[in-house]
């Protein structure tokens, strides 16, 4: 299976504190991978390293089989962040303008849209079912609708890999399920590789097929099915430890003074 992302023994620290230690994992072509972990686990740092925002201090990262340092074809990667709502009522922009801004990796800024660009915009909006909102101001849309537009912005360059960083932050509960179902459909119908950075266990349990759990180091790396068994085993271990502590307390209470 072709590897889209390969991370080998990557470590990173801020000052003297380790953010990541000897991280290693692979993301296969066509997979829907969930990168999970608690706050402060290093998820955001790992994402910044993959995207080249931070420079690794140890180990290696490859994208589409190339060393990250040599990788130039960033048009292959679409990105949706939890802060995509930078386009809002304070900076008015139409849905069309927001989606078109995703073409800058191909065209640069302030380039006139040609027919192919317009076809790509139409394709992206159709994929997220937002074609009727083409000329609406982005600030007028709900949180869920805005995130659909930002996915369209990431899709407009027709990437092979879509990376999403906590994409449902600020999205109402009613729209979260529809949002993840859209991602699953992209993965299924277009064989798009997805890397979802999240702490949403519902999404992990329901939609992804590959789970990577980190807490400054690799905690788990395997299929979603294997992860369910891992969680069940951990729960049993926690219950057993709780019982041992309760028994120890009972023994203490029963001891003569």
From Swiss-Prot:
Belongs to the ABC transporter superfamily. This is Zinc uptake system ATP-binding protein ZurA. It comes from the Bacteria. One of its GO terms (cellular component) is ATP-binding cassette (ABC) transporter complex. The gene is zurA. Involved in a zinc uptake transport system. Keywords: ATP-binding, Nucleotide-binding, Transport, Zinc. Gene3D superfamilies: P-loop containing nucleotide triphosphate hydrolases. ATP binds at residues 37-44. Residues 5-241 form the ABC transporter domain. It comes from Listeria monocytogenes serovar 1/2a (strain ATCC BAA-679 / EGD-e). The keyword NADP does not apply. GO terms for molecular function: ATP binding; ATP hydrolysis activity; ATPase-coupled transmembrane transporter activity.
């Amino acid at each position: 299976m072709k590897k889209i992302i390969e991370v080998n023994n990557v470590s990173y620290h801020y000052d003297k504190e380790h953010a990541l230690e000897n991280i290693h994992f692979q993301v296969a072509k066509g997979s829907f991978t969930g990168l999970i972990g608690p706050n402060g686990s290093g998820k955001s740092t790992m994402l910044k390293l993959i995207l080249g925002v931070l420079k690794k201090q140890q180990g290696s990262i490859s994208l589409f089989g190339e060393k990250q340092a040599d990788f130039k074809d960033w048009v292959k990667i679409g990105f949706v962040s939890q802060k995509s709502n930078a386009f809002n009522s304070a900076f008015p922009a139409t849905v069309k303008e927001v989606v078109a801004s995703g073409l800058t990796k191909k065209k640069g800024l302030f380039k006139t849209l040609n027919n192919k660009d317009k076809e790509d915009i139409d394709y992206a909006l159709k994929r997220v079912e937002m074609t009727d909102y083409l000329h609406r101001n982005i600030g007028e849309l709900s949180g869920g609708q805005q995130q659909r537009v930002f996915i369209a912005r990431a899709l407009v360059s027709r990437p092979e890999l879509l990376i999403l960083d906590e994409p449902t932050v600020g999205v109402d509960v009613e729209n979260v399920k529809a949002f993840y179902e859209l991602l699953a459909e992209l993965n299924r119908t277009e064989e798009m590789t997805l890397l979802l950075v999240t702490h949403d266990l519902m999404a992990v349990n329901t939609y992804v097929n590959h789970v990577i759990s980190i807490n400054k180091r690799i905690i788990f790396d395997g299929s979603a099915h294997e992860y369910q068994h891992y969680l069940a085993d951990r729960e049993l271990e926690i219950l057993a430890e709780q019982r041992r502590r309760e028994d120890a307390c009972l023994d203490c209470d029963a001891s003569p003074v």
